[in-house]
Swiss-Prot record:
Keyword list, A-Z: Ribonucleoprotein, Ribosomal protein, RNA-binding, rRNA-binding
Name of the protein in its database record: Small ribosomal subunit protein uS4
Domain spans labelled S4 RNA-binding: 93-156
Pfam family, one: Ribosomal_S4
Annotated Gene3D superfamilies: Ribosomal Protein S4 Delta 41, Chain A, domain 1, RNA-binding S4 domain
GO molecular function, one term: structural constituent of ribosome
Name of encoding gene: rpsD
KW S-adenosyl-L-methionine (keyword) present: no
Subunit annotation: Part of the 30S ribosomal subunit. Contacts protein S5. The interaction surface between S4 and S5 is involved in control of translational fidelity.
Xref: SUPFAM superfamilies: Alpha-L RNA-binding motif
Length: 204
């Protein structure tokens, strides 16, 4: 099993896309993958296209492990309705995804870090598990003593991202309410995500 990448720049380079739409992505400077000159491009197979769609979605949410990601797919497929839409809804209820959407932090990786370090409360109680599943109506906030962290202050003042409609935010108190699990069209992905191809990958 290969080592999981935990660097946003390394993931961008591996996939060849600016996954989070960040100005400092190495993809903005060149159009080839890792290595001195990248790899010669070939027409991808159906499998390759499906695999890339899966890797993009996994990578976007902080390079979730294959074991965890497959469990999300299995849960999505067991629910009523469209499996691809269900998968997006599940991923967007992860606590690290919600904290990232709230603009409390600049990246999903830093979101995971401040959660693991105990800086986040859900309904007034500390939650230190990044994969914790947020429910409709949950209130997520930064601990009062942690609100002056430079990382958090800079992220809250940034104009790089917008807060989606399925979260209401009190920026002054670094507090937000999760209104509902979104559909694909509601999620502000900076690159095209194709969860339908992820479903095809696992359905082979």
């Amino acid at each position: 099993m290969g080592k999981r990448l935990n660097s946003k720049h390394k993931i961008d380079r591996r996939l060849g896309v600016n996954l989070w739409g960040r100005p400092k992505s190495p993809i903005n400077k060149r159009e080839y993958g890792p290595g001195e000159h990248g790899q010669r491009r070939r027409k991808p197979s159906d499998f390759g296209i499906q695999l890339m769609a899966k890797q993009k979605l996994k990578g976007y949410y902080g390079n979730i492990s294959e074991k965890a990601f497959r469990k999300y797919y299995e849960e999505a497929s067991s629910r009523r309705g469209d499996t691809s839409e269900n998968l997006i809804s599940i991923l967007e209820t992860r606590l690290d995804a919600v904290v990232y959407r709230m603009k409390i932090v600049p990246t999903v990786f830093s979101s995971r870090q401040i959660i693991n370090h105990g800086h986040i409360l859900v309904n007034g109680r500390r939650v230190s598990v990044a994969s914790y599943r947020v429910q409709e109506g949950d209130v997520i906030e930064v601990k009062e003593k942690s609100r002056q962290m430079p990382l958090i202050l800079e992220a809250l003042q940034s104009h790089e991202r917008d807060i989606p409609e399925y979260i209401t935010m009190d920026l002054a108190h670094a507090k937000g309410t999760f209104l509902r699990a979104p559909k694909l069209e509601d999620v502000p992905y900076p690159v095209q995500m194709e969860p339908n191809l992820v479903v095809e990958f696992y359905s082979r």
